[in-house]
């Protein structure tokens, strides 16, 4: 399976990489959060732009992205506008969403963008191509905060992301039962062993699903989300604890 290299970070080999989310509402919040994150042990910084109040003004967004890059200079920056329908804070039209991601790509300030699978195939394909022309990697994502689809459906969505050109397909689902967590892990193994030719990221959310955030190296998920201060999704654990567990599993 091929790995994905972003700056000097190789995703898809060794222990799963740790992603943390920055969620400031104003440029002042963004800067203070970035400063607070500087000493934390993580691999990729995700900026959750849907938390940023002034998201429809490209200048403000790019000013904030520049501020993050000045403060955290040594980590890849993942630019993510999570839509309201997939658990995010704000709603944009498809046109606004694509334009925002293209502006981020154009800026040269971000290393990766997150594109939601169900944005529309044509828009997604074109935006993936655009990102790749500018040497920006794409995490393609899907989130279900209500349930865990059947394993076949999870695999199908991950394969679709791969077909649409994602560098890293990602899915997060909500378990209603312990068996749902096994469904997600089963789908992860099947995708990783039978279909994936690139790294994937999967997780089962909430406290019930926390094992999926820790055992990625065993089942085939290449990255996991941790919390520095406030969790960006249910079930995230602190980055320090996360690194300890990932290292134990890696060295076992």
UniProtKB/Swiss-Prot annotation:
EC annotation from Swiss-Prot or TrEMBL: 4.2.1.10
Entry keywords, A to Z: Amino-acid biosynthesis, Aromatic amino acid biosynthesis, Lyase, Schiff base
Pathway membership, UniProt: Metabolic intermediate biosynthesis; chorismate biosynthesis; chorismate from D-erythrose 4-phosphate and phosphoenolpyruvate: step 3/7
Residues spanning the signal sequence: none
Molecular function (Gene Ontology), one example: 3-dehydroquinate dehydratase activity
Active site: residue positions: 143, 170
Catalyses which reaction(s): 3-dehydroquinate = 3-dehydroshikimate + H2O
The keyword Aminoacyl-tRNA synthetase appears for this protein: no
One Gene Ontology biological process: aromatic amino acid family biosynthetic process
Residues annotated to bind 3-dehydroquinate: 21, 46-48, 82, 213, 232, 236
Top-level taxon: Bacteria
Family: Belongs to the type-I 3-dehydroquinase family.
Assembly information from the UniProt record: Homodimer.
HAMAP family per UniProt: AroD
Role description: Involved in the third step of the chorismate pathway, which leads to the biosynthesis of aromatic amino acids. Catalyzes the cis-dehydration of 3-dehydroquinate (DHQ) and introduces the first double bond of the aromatic ring to yield 3-dehydroshikimate.
PANTHER family, per database record: 3-DEHYDROQUINATE DEHYDRATASE (PTHR43699:SF1)
Protein name: 3-dehydroquinate dehydratase
UniProt gene name: aroD
